[in-house]
Every structure is written in C-alpha cells, then in structure tokens.
Amino acid sequence: MEEEMMILGVDGGSTKTLAIVFDERSERIMGVGISGPSNFTNAPRETAESNISDAVRKACSEAGTDLDGIGIRVFGLAGIGDSREATELGKDIVRSIVGHADVYSDGLGAYKFANLNDDGVVFAPGTGSVGFIKNGSDPERFGGWGWFIGDEASASWMAKQAILFAEREHDGIAETGFLDVVRRYFGMDLYETVYAISKEKIAKRVVAALAPQVSAMARSGNRYAISIFEESSSYIADLLNAKSRIFGRSGKYSVLGGTMLAGDFYRDMIRKKSSVDVSIYYGYQVAIGDVLIGIEKKGSISVDLRNKMIDQLNSILENKKEDIKKFLFLDSVPTS
C-alpha cells in the first residue's frame, strides 16, 4: 500500500486509547488497536506513552504496515488545550512515539466524528464530560470543569451519585440498594473507599468504571439508579436546548460517550426531554473523527463515509472480545 494512502487516527482519554489505520484508497479500516488510558494530565507520562504506543503498534500490525508506511497521523488526546504546558507535554509524548503527527484535543475529533463540519453542538459524557459548540468557526469548548465539582452526566459523576446513595443507606436514611454494590466493587469498607477517593488514591477512571453497574441497576428497576439517569438526562437536554437557541433551533446536535451504552431507556430519556433532534454515538467510535480530519487534508468527507467506517469498526471490534471487555467495558458491540 502506498504511504500517502494510509492514515493513522488515535483517540486517547482517561479510560482507553484506540488507534485506527485506514486505507484511503479502498476506504477500509485495515487495523485497530486498543489499550489503556493516555490522559497524561491524570496519569504518569510513562503510562500515557506506553498505552499510546501499544494501541498504535497493534493497529499497524493488524494492518500489515508500520509507521513508515503511514503518511498522515492524527492524534486526538484528552489534556491537549487544557493549558500551554499540558499541550506541549502531549505533543512531546506523541513525537517521542511516532515522530511527525498532527495533535489536537480529543474534542476536535469528537466533533468531527459526530457533526462533521456542520454547525451545532456535541456533548461528550465519557469518564468525564465536556461540550463543544461550532458556529461558523472552529468548535469551542464548554463544560469540562473536572470531576471534583463538574463533569456532570459523566461516568465519574454517576459513580459519585452511586456512592452518595450508598452513604445514605449506610446511615439508615434510605434502602437504596447501593451499599453492597459499592462495597463489592471497591473491595473495602465504605469509609475507607470515600477516604481513598478523597485522597486520590483511587484513580478517576476506576471510580468511573462503577457506572455500568449503576446502569444495570437502573435497567432492573432500582428507582434510585433511575433517578441518577433522570438527573443526567435532564442536564443534557437542558444544555442542548439552551445552546440550540443560538442557532434558532437549527444546527446539528449530538451526544457521544461511554455513558450512552447504559441502554435504550437512557437514550430515550435524553431524546424525549430535548427540543431538538439528537444523534447519539459511543465513545469508542471517536477515533474515526481523527481519521476524518486526516482525510480532509487531501479530500472531502461525508456522512456516508463516516457511517461506513462505523460499520467496519464495529465488525472488527466484535472479534476483539478480550480487548473490548478489558478496555471498553463491553461484552459485545452495540447494534443500535
């Protein structure tokens, strides 16, 4: 394969790193690599480097190529844009692994994936949460205040709500059903858990990984778990409705992130409460946006091409059961 036809797109965040090698000539994803977190602002540089390198190596190996065979390399990393220092650190990490590359905020890839070049809003509730609005220029960020006070509707926020309900059950205020769930998940007394989290002895991504159990409880009818999703969906609808007034209800509105895997019940809540049409995607698909940025360096992109890549990625991931369970917390790839 000719070098100029190969594109590497990498999305790195607080929970996982996913790399895609795409052949522009055949319009096919040739390789996919998944590894652990690469948000260098809340993990050691060595961890971020190792996981980015691992994901890239896996994707290249599956594609039957190496970095010399890839002409365009686009990285979308959490932490880029947080500060000048963070941005330089992220770019330096990428250079140390692949040499020349275009490095952007993971939000730019997320926006490109969901809305392409249309004006509108993308809200991304994953491990944390952040939003982007585009109105005739480059997407601008909003939200993303961090998990101590902000990151509403994110997996870490949902996990914190679950711990709060566990505290209420512990204190005899309400039988929420969360106390045993939280104890089993963290493997320690509730007081010890709260102390460890407050002292940052338990990583944000580990706390956030409790969210799938909250989803399962909601699907089984636990009213306290359902209330978490009611509050979360109301927040998402409120922000979409508020931002839509800027566009006079026109524009494109998308929500993407791992929390969208909670189930149809949650996606339906968001759509019913929103006054605009909402497209919903999943966080593991965002690396496609980085590939689309690469394609635009020489050509054009379309919804049809994006959707074709989604189908290809889903098909490839179905054959990576161990990786999607370990890094994406999925037993299978969603079909809707």
Curated annotation (Swiss-Prot):
CDD domains, sorted: ASKHA_NBD_KdgK-like
Keyword Acyltransferase: no
Keywords, alphabetical: ATP-binding, Kinase, Nucleotide-binding, Transferase
Regulation: Probably activated by phosphorylation and inhibited by dephosphorylation.
pH-linked activity: Optimum pH is 4.0-5.0.
Top class in the EC scheme: transferase
MF terms in GO: 2-dehydro-3-deoxygluconokinase activity; ATP binding
Residues that bind ATP: 15, 127, 208
Catalytic activity field: 2-dehydro-3-deoxy-D-gluconate + ATP = 2-dehydro-3-deoxy-6-phospho-D-gluconate + ADP + H(+)
Record note on temperature dependence: Optimum temperature is 70 degrees Celsius.
Record Gene3D superfamilies: 3.30.420.40
Highest taxon of the lineage: Archaea
Enzyme Commission no: 2.7.1.45
Annotated function: Catalyzes the phosphorylation of 2-keto-3-deoxygluconate (KDG) to produce 2-keto-3-deoxy-6-phosphogluconate (KDPG). Is specific for KDG.
Subunit details: Homooctamer.
Family: Belongs to the eukaryotic-type N-acetylglucosamine kinase family.
Name assigned to this protein: 2-dehydro-3-deoxygluconokinase
